[in-house]
């Protein structure tokens, strides 16, 4: 079969390290009847060992050449191939609690993670290969340099853990950055639930717009000092010092106040 060359516009770096591949599959723990969706199967490094354990495997792939390759594989009868852009894919169109896995293209990782957060209620767990610095931002705790908007928003939906460090030489072509595998499990019992999620998302975005400024300055168009203090936030704090549940509490307080 003709060798497939990685395409930069699709952010393709193909995993080839068999040890890492095995570790990822073991982390996913696929059972025969599981509903599993793989994003960006590429050259089937993870696809093949997953398919061996599953009755059916959904794959989402934008590269037409790779789609053609997938159709010729010995286990192609187990694959349900969805050709297209994963950012436009309807995850709710596949019924059942889903396990989602993939080596995510670095150039669309953040918008894709936010899209997946929208379907968290229908997800069992997710395992993704990502740029390591992105994973560190996802799992970061308050008062750390990596803690920011991405972490707050995703921690609202998921419990997350950095599972596996992946060096550049595990890929072909080798990227110029380190990678990591993250496990994401939907939160079962949230400390607080946002009454108006759009308001909560806007508040968090504004809070981190200028990290060096105080929360008072960043949120001045939404909240005054009394509002902040009402939920236990010091107006002098910076955004990275404030836990996710405090942002939820502030959003709910402001929403109630506006009624």
Curated annotation (Swiss-Prot):
Q: What is its EC number?
A: 2.1.1.182
Q: Does the UniProt entry include the keyword RNA-binding? A: yes
The broad enzyme category this protein falls into is transferase
One matching Pfam family: RrnaAD
Q: Which InterPro entries match?
A: KsgA/Erm, rRNA_Ade_diMease-like_C, rRNA_Ade_Mease_Trfase_CS, rRNA_Ade_methylase_Trfase_N, rRNA_adenine_dimethylase, SAM-dependent_MTases_sf
User: Which Cys-Cys disulfides exist here?
Assistant: none
Q: What residues bind S-adenosyl-L-methionine, as annotated?
A: 13, 15, 40, 61, 85, 103
**Domain of life of the native organism:** Bacteria
Name recorded for this polypeptide = Ribosomal RNA small subunit methyltransferase A
Q: Which gene encodes it?
A: rsmA
């Amino acid at each position: 079969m003709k060798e497939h060359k990685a395409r930069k516009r699709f952010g393709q770096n193909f995993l080839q390290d068999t040890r890492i591949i095995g570790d990822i599959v073991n982390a996913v723990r696929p059972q025969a009847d599981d509903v599993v969706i793989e994003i960006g199967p590429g050259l089937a490094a993870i696809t093949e060992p997953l398919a061996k354990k599953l009755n059916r495997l959904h794959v989402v792939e934008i590269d037409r050449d790779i789609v053609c390759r997938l159709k010729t594989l010995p286990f192609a009868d187990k694959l349900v191939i969805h050709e297209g852009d994963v950012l436009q894919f309807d995850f709710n169109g596949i019924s059942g609690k889903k396990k989602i896995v993939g080596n995510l293209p670095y150039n669309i990782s953040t918008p894709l993670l936010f899209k997946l957060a929208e379907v968290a209620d229908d997800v069992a767990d997710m395992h993704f290969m990502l740029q390591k610095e992105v994973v560190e931002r996802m799992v970061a705790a308050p008062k750390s340099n990596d803690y920011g908007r991405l972490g707050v928003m995703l921690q609202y939906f998921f419990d997350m853990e950095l599972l596996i460090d992946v060096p550049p030489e595990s890929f072909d072509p080798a990227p110029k950055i380190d990678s990591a595998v993250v496990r994401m499990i939907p939160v079962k019992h949230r400390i607080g639930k946002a009454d108006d999620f759009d308001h909560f998302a806007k508040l968090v975005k504004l809070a981190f717009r200028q990290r060096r400024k105080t929360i008072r300055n960043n949120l001045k168009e939404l909240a005054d000092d009394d509002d902040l203090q009402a939920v236990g936030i010091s107006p002098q704090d910076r955004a990275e010092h404030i836990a996710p549940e405090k942002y939820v509490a502030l959003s709910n307080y402001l929403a109630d106040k506006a009624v």
